[in-house]
Swiss-Prot record:
It is found in: Membrane. It comes from the Eukaryota. May be a general defense protein. It comes from Oryza sativa subsp. japonica. Keywords: ATP-binding, Membrane, Nucleotide-binding, Repeat, Transmembrane, Transmembrane helix, Transport. This is ABC transporter G family member 53. ATP 1 binds at residues 186-193. Residues 504-717, 1174-1388 form the ABC transmembrane type-2 domain. ATP 2 binds at residues 894-901. Pfam families: ABC2_membrane, ABC2_membrane_7, ABC_tran, ABC_trans_N, PDR_assoc. It is a multi-pass membrane protein. The keyword Transmembrane applies. Coiled coil: none annotated. The chain crosses the membrane at residues 523-543, 555-575, 610-630, 641-661, 666-686, 752-772, 1195-1215, 1225-1242, 1281-1301, 1308-1328, 1338-1358, 1363-1383, 1415-1435.
Length: 1446
């Protein structure tokens, strides 16, 4: 057998290798049994089929067509009608999964085929990380530079390594057996993810691993573990533009789904020998899944059915800015993507996040059926498994603080803990008990010896006790006897690295790249439109009626036109940076899981986009060539076309390489600007070859722009139009123009240039492939930890007990290091079981909210319209009514897609699109969003926070802006401390928040922060969207304790919630239950032990009674599911609306919809809690912290500035002192032009992703009415000013001195002045472009056009005096033109020295450029004005536009 697919009932893939001959179940999971009687015709066809040779029999099947006809078909060559009939017939496979698996197993057993199995052993496994301890680990600018220098010194063995070792897994051992389901449990930071990664052979490179892991006795270097096992990550990384079906289908193609040929041949051969007739539906499924073009589609359809994804199969996955499937559906896509792999062992990390308990149960049950029937191996980590889900598992692994506390059969786990003095209470879920019993804070409540004094039992004692327990002894005895390798099935372990042929992998990537191009077509259409606009501008600026072939000066203008064309084509590739980096996280995941080699990914990204290059170059060349007046020769036209085409491919390859090397948007933008700078400076146009310093001449020879400039210039100036002489010269004019610009005047340089550029195309794409092959993601998670937490971890390893200290501080990256903060939390002052009202002492007004007949609809999606639906709108909420009251905790529940989050968004006023109908009142008064936002809080499902501030700073910022202005800072600080105590965040107060899934806080810590951010606002009504999603049982209990405490203060709290445990569910007072389609089916009290809820549903005919000890929430979701409605013929919505409960609720709504006597409507004297000045100060404070701790932006910017300054200084060394001729002046001006262009573009492009990330946080904070848009914009603008000042000083001092401009105070400070405000307006322009566009990628593309236009009209490529009169107006609105005006005039506008020809420099500046010295102060005002204008437009765009669609 070759598949994890079997393992999950989802499909396998038997390789066509000799070792696979005996394998067998791969197709297993996708077929449904049919008990239909065979008629005579079918019997005759089968008789004929059995006479065929094995080879033909494996490809031929009997297919029932929709009209009833039985047709003998070759599954490798199906027509469209037959293909459709086959897929329709097999659509039922997922509905009877266990029966299908049993039929398959019976079939292989009958012919004696043995299915392969894997036993995984791990012995003395240790995993360590290295981390900086304390504040040194924070990513500040100074720490970043210090770390780089220290790392270099460590490499050279100059200084010792100051990082401390952190133990993640400590000496763990165990056995994971086939045919058994293993549940992995443990508190946050226990090391669960690291253990799963280690067992799957996918440990991050930064970790040190020792010990041994074997599969069937084979060490990991004897086979390919990443194909023999499948690892399902807890992070949902997908390409948002693809649909669910396309995402899973791509994985199926890459992982070898459909390669079941060997199994099929062996089955057919043995069945023919023994005259066995297989089940016809199992037979056709196996054949369809093993051969033919539909094989991956068959497998994909089955997986989608089993995981309940068939209802959203054709919906795009979506991302932060692209609306797609729900979070729970996305989690299932992550599972589906991996369970089609050929691995026989499954390691699944937190696959239930965002799923309701019934969905989790169904998925785990499907996996269990596969494991038990076909013999797979599975370890699944779950956060809050319901008791019925827990019962599906055979074995338990309990980890705590990197040590195995228990590993063995589920039925003995409670026996073990009772042997050490701890007992699980009767109504406590065993999984919840196991999560909490090793925790210092929660352990005491489970102590069973009331007559003995309790003492805390550390993890080490549990681990040692387990070694003495009979289960631990049995494991140790079994590990002492090595696994007999001869028992390992030859098909169990994979030795080939990839699951499909290179041709198939390349085709899969090509198909996906074409799909992505279609979905991102807006970007490419926009680029083409933008290029067309630039073409129009260029041909009207360099129009032939104004340009002549009669002088060297005019030749220089033509040279500028050619140079501008090359620049436009080169800048056109800049958008590749953003598009490439956006896809890298998914690529790295798929590369590490061996979906495909890097070259099959990089090649399509190059080849498939070549037609776009053809289109872009065609637009440019064929529109501009004759209008500008280039040499009218068709051959030279096509030569220019060929050259620019190759140049476009070079540019795209260069920027893809930069993106692949940098792997970070800001760093890549900086590197891209740097490369453009080097290539342009040394390309021969800005600085001619004769003027390039000897120490930089090598750069001239390696610049792609040099070869392009030489080739395109030779092609033009050796043409007929320039083959004329002018007075005073014997050589042709074209050759004179070439020589004046330092270009080689020989025809061969055209082909030299084309050849060199083709070489660069290959080189850059090869380098890009190499980067993708060998480099890891940019954020290679470097964990940091506080000294106190490190001591606690070390104490847990040694069994010591340390005293609690006043405050713990942790900064941890759970994704890599799994640092445990559990004990650090427990060391802090204990939170009582009901500290509730403490910490909620600030006064507030209790408020109720009622809503009646709420309807919400959206425009009908095009995908659904394409299926024949004629309605213009899709209704998501259908007349919902209810009320939420003070002091009452309400659970908003329903299966995925029921509309829970939609209803909450509507009530909270968070919807930005769609159509809302119905009435909402707040304590009897109509809801007004402006005032409602002041008294309400909203905890979003996605925990959105500024990544570069600490936990305490996040809370301080929220409290500062949302609490009333009359509350003084001391009271506010006290309140923040109390809220942190309430949600147990005090030990994490100095932890950096970080980015989800990348750095900083763990999922559950981030969730508690989200709640705390709302609590510090002291709201009357709080909405919480899945506050326990992604948390383990203990963390969920902490969160629920905080929520319960909040409710007990008299607040109104509503929570959507998935898969709650019995404890959590019964902590709610009322339940608002919805069914799929947006209708309520129960709105009422939960009752003691859920008695009210159970009584209501059990009174409905056809509803099964709840079993003793069963989770009421799980039972409720099961009995009200759509499937049960169909089975029982019950419409729960109609029953509810005809019930007494509904009438009581309507009466309550009516009562609460009338204002109480003596009450008044909500009103506030001001729109926001704080004054405008306070809002500005708060926003500036947060931005200052964010910038200081964002070294990829700030530290890289300064490093880039220093490097660029040194490059400019050495390239233009001393040109400021040379004034012999006009070329000397042009060289000096070139240094100014290049510095303005490149430093400015770098500032603009690097600030865009920073603003884009913060804008997502801004949307949440603005919706909460924390501040108005203007203070946010002012804070973002103001924080840049000091950083730009430092940048200007660094650059200005270095460059001014090295270039050798005149050392007078006035000229020096004028130079600094213009550089400072130029960098400012470029930076503010970058911010503005993000504010005006929906995403960073669009902003990047739009900006490229403006950079090009500013470049053209700057006055360097073509001076103002030569710009056509109809375009001269734009010169005056081009900010770069004003900058160059100011720089040149301030340095040379008053110089009375003369050139060699006797012309005074100041006169030449005035006559040639049109620069007047007495206009300098006006120029200065204009440059400042542009900075102010762009900053103002950024603020205006932030205020007006909201691109977040909800």
């Amino acid at each position: 057998m070759d598949d994890a697919g079997e393992i999950h009932a989802l499909g396998g893939s038997l390789r066509r290798e000799a070792s696979s001959a005996r394998s067998g179940d791969a197709a297993v999971f996708f077929s449904r049994s049919s008990s239909r009687d065979e008629d005579d015709e079918e019997a005759l066809r089968w008789a004929a089929l059995e006479k065929l040779p094995t080879y033909d029999r494996a490809r031929t099947a009997v297919l029932a067509m929709p009209e009833g006809e039985l047709r003998e078909v070759n599954v490798q060559r199906l027509g469209p009608q037959e293909r459709h009939a086959l897929l329709q017939r097999l659509a039922w496979v997922g509905d009877d999964h266990a029966r299908f698996l049993s039929k398959f197993k019976d079939r292989v057993d009958r012919v004696g085929i043995e299915l392969p199995t894997i036993e995984v052993r791990y012995e003395n496994l240790n995993v360590e990380a290295e981390a900086y301890v304390g504040s040194r680990g924070l990513p500040t600018i100074l720490n970043t530079y210090a770390n780089v220098l220290e790392g270099l010194a460590n490499t050279l063995h100059i200084t010792p390594n100051r990082k401390q070792k952190i133990s993640i897994l400590h000496n763990v051992s165990g056995i994971i057996k086939p045919h058994r389901m293993t549940l992995l449990l443990g508190p946050p930071g226990a090391g669960k993810t690291t253990l799963l990664l280690a067992l799957a052979g996918n440990v991050p490179s930064g970790l040190k691993v020792s010990g041994q892991i074997t599969y069937n006795g084979h060490t990991m270097d004897e086979f390919e573990p990443r194909r023999s096992a499948a690892y399902v990550s807890q992070h949902d990384l997908h390409m948002g533009e693809l649909t669910v079906r396309e995402t899973v289908n791509f994985s199926a193609k890459c992982q070898g789904i459909g390669h079941r040929y060997d199994l099929l041949m062996e089955l057919s051969r043995r069945e023919k020998e023994e005259n066995i007739k297989p089940d016809p539906e199992v037979d056709i499924y196996l054949k369809a899944a093993a051969t033919g073009e539909q094989k991956a589609e068959v497998v994909t359809n089955h997986i989608l059915k089993v995981l309940g994804l068939d209802i959203c199969a054709d919906t795009i996955v979506g991302n932060n800015m692209l609306r797609g499937i729900s979070g729970g559906q996305k989690k299932r896509v992550t599972t589906a993507e991996m369970i089609v792999t050929p691995g026989r062992a499954l390691f699944m990390d937190e696959i239930s996040t965002g799923l309701d308990s019934s969905t989790t149960y169904n998925i785990v049950d499907s996996i269990r059926q596969t494991i038990h029937i076909v013999g797979g191996t599975a370890v699944i980590a779950l956060l809050q498994p319901a008791p019925e889900t827990y019962e599906l598992f055979d074995d338990i692994i309990l980890l705590s603080d990197g040590q195995v506390v228990y590993n063995g059969p589920r039925e003995h786990v409670l026996e073990f803990f009772e042997s050490v003095g701890f007992k699980c209470p009767e109504r406590k879920g065993v999984a919840d008990f196991l999560q909490e019993v090793t925790s210092r804070k929660d352990q005491r409540q489970y102590w069973m010896h009331g007559d003995e004094t309790y003492r805390y039992v550390p993890v080490k004692e549990f681990a040692e006790a387990f070694q003495s327990f009979h289960v631990g002894q049995a494991i140790r005895s079994e590990l002492a006897i090595p696994f007999d390798k001869s028992r390992s099935h030859p098909a169990a372990l994979k030795t080939s690295k990839y699951g499909a042929s290179m041709k198939e992998l390349l085709k899969a990537n090509i198909d996906r790249e074409i799909l992505l191009m279609k979905r991102n077509s807006f970007v490419y259409i926009f680029k083409a439109t933008q290029l067309t606009l630039m073409t129009f501008i260029a041909m009207t600026v360099f129009i032939r009626t104004n340009m002549h072939h009669d002088s060297i000066t005019n030749g220089g203008i033509y040279m500028g036109a050619l140079f501008f064309g090359i620049l436009m084509i080169m800048f056109n590739g800049l958008a590749e940076v953003g598009l490439t980096i956006a896809k890298l996280p998914v690529f790295f995941k798929q590369r590490d899981l061996l979906f495909y080699p890097a070259w099959t990914y990089s090649l399509p990204s190059w080849i498939i986009k070549t037609p776009l290059s053809l289109l872009n170059v065609t637009i440019w060349v064929f529109i501009t060539y004759y209008v500008i007046g280039f040499d009218p020769n068709v051959e030279r036209l096509f030569r220019q076309f060929l050259l620019l085409l190759v140049m476009n491919e070079t540019s795209s390859g260069l920027f893809r390489f930069i993106a692949g090397f940098a792997r970070h948007q800001v760093v890549a933008s900086t590197m891209g600007s740097f490369c453009i700078l080097i290539f342009m400076l040394l390309g021969g146009f800005i600085l001619s070859r004769e003027n390039v310093k000897k120490w930089w001449i090598w750069g001239y020879w390696i610049s792609p722009l040099m070869y392009a400039q030489n080739a395109i210039s030779v092609n033009e100036f050796l043409g007929h139009s320039w083959n004329k002489t002018i007075p005073g010269f014997r050589e042709p004019l074209g050759k004179l123009v070439l020589e004046s610009r330092g270009v080689f005047p020989e025809a061969k340089w055209y082909w030299i240039g084309v050849g060199a550029l083709l070489g660069y195309v290959l080189l850059f794409n090869i380098l890009y492939t190499i980067c993708l092959t060998f480099l890891n993601p940019f954020d290679s998670n470097q964990p940091t930890i506080s000294e106190e937490t490190l001591k606690i971890k070390q104490a847990n390893l040694t069994g010591d007990v340390i005293e609690a200290s006043s405050r713990g501080r942790i900064t941890t990256n759970t994704n890599t290091a799994d640092d445990s903060n559990d004990e650090a939390i427990s060391n802090h002052a204990t939170v009582n079981s009901s500290p509730g009202k403490k910490g909620m002492v600030l006064p507030f007004v209790p408020l109720s909210i009622t809503f009646e007949d709420i309807r919400y609809s959206v425009d009908m999606p095009e995908v659904i319209k394409a299926q024949g639906v004629t309605e213009s709108r899709l209704e998501l909420l259908k007349g919902i009514s209810g009320s939420f009251r003070p002091g009452v905790l309400t659970a908003l529940m329903g299966v995925s897609g029921a509309g829970k989050t939609t209803l909450m968004d509507v009530l909270a006023g968070r919807k930005t699109s769609g159509y809302i109908e119905g009435n909402i009142t707040i304590s009897g008064y109509p809801k007004k969003q402006e005032t409602f936002a002041r008294v309400s809080g909203y905890c979003e499902q996605n925990d959105i926070h500024s990544p570069n501030v600490t936990v305490y700073e996040s809370l301080a910022f929220s409290a500062w802006l949302r609490l009333p202005a009359e509350i003084d800072s001391a009271t506010r600080k006290m309140f923040i401390d109390e809220v942190m105590e309430l949600v147990e965040l005090s030990p994490l107060k100095d932890s950096l928040v970080g980015l989800p899934g990348v750095s900083g806080l763990s999922t559950e810590q981030r969730k508690r922060l989200t709640i705390a951010v709302e609590l510090v606002a002291n709201p009357s009504i709080i909405f919480m969207d899945e506050p326990t999603s992604g948390l383990d049982a203990r963390a969920a209990a902490i969160v629920m304790r905080a929520i319960r405490n909040t409710v007990d203060t008299g607040r109104t709290v509503v929570c959507t919630i998935h898969q709650p445990s019995i404890d959590i569910f019964e902590s709610f007072d009322e339940l608002f239950l919805m069914k799929r389609g947006g209708e309520e089916i129960y709105v009422g009290p939960v009752g003691q032990h859920s008695c009210e809820l159970i009584r209501y549903f059990e009174s409905i005919e056809g509803v099964s009674k709840i079993k003793h000890g069963y989770n009421p929430s799980t039972w409720m979701l099961e009995v009200t599911s759509t499937v049960q409605e169909q089975i029982t013929g019950v419409n729960f919505s109609e029953i509810y609306k005809n019930s007494e409960l509904y009438r009581r609720n309507k009466s309550m709504i009516k009562e609460l919809s009338s204002p109480p006597d003596g009450s008044s409507d909500l009103s506030f004297p001001t729109e926001y809690s704080q004054t405008f000045i306070t809002q500005c100060l708060a926003c500036l404070w947060k931005q200052s912290l964010s910038y200081w701790r964002n070294p990829p932006y700030t530290a890289v910017k300064y490093f880039y500035t220093i490097v660029i300054a040194l490059l400019f200084g050495t390239m233009f060394w001393g040109v400021g002192r040379k004034r012999s001729n006009q070329q000397d002046l042009f060289n000096a001006m070139g240094s100014m032009y290049a510095s303005v262009l490149f430093m400015g573009v770098q500032n603009s492009s690097s600030v865009q992703p920073v603003v884009s990330v913060e804008r997502t946080v801004f949307y949440r904070e603005r919706a909460a009415h924390m501040y108005s848009p203007l203070p946010y914009a002012l804070g973002q603008v103001a924080i840049e000013l000091p950083y730009i000042l430092v940048q200007s000083l660094i650059y200005g001092v270095l460059v001014y001195a090295m270039i050798g401009f005149e050392w007078t105070a006035a000229k020096f400070f004028w130079y600094l002045f213009f550089m400072y405000f130029t960098l400012s307006y470029y930076t503010f322009y970058g911010m503005m472009s993000v504010g005006l566009t929906p995403s960073y990628n669009v902003a990047s593309v739009v900006s490229t056009a403006f950079y090009a236009i500013w470049n053209l009209f700057s006055g360097f490529i073509i001076p103002r005096t030569r710009i056509p009169i109809w375009w001269r107006w734009y010169y005056w609105v081009c900010p770069v033109a004003w900058t160059l005006y100011g720089l040149v005039t301030s340095q040379f506008g008053d110089v009375t020295d003369t050139f060699d020809n006797g012309v005074r420099i100041s006169d030449f500046v005035e006559s040639y450029f049109g620069y007047h010295r007495d206009f300098l102060w006006v120029v200065a005002v204009m440059v400042v004005s542009f900075a102010v204008l762009f900053a103002f437009l950024f603020g205006l765009s932030i205020k007006i536009f909201n691109f977040q669609k909800r």
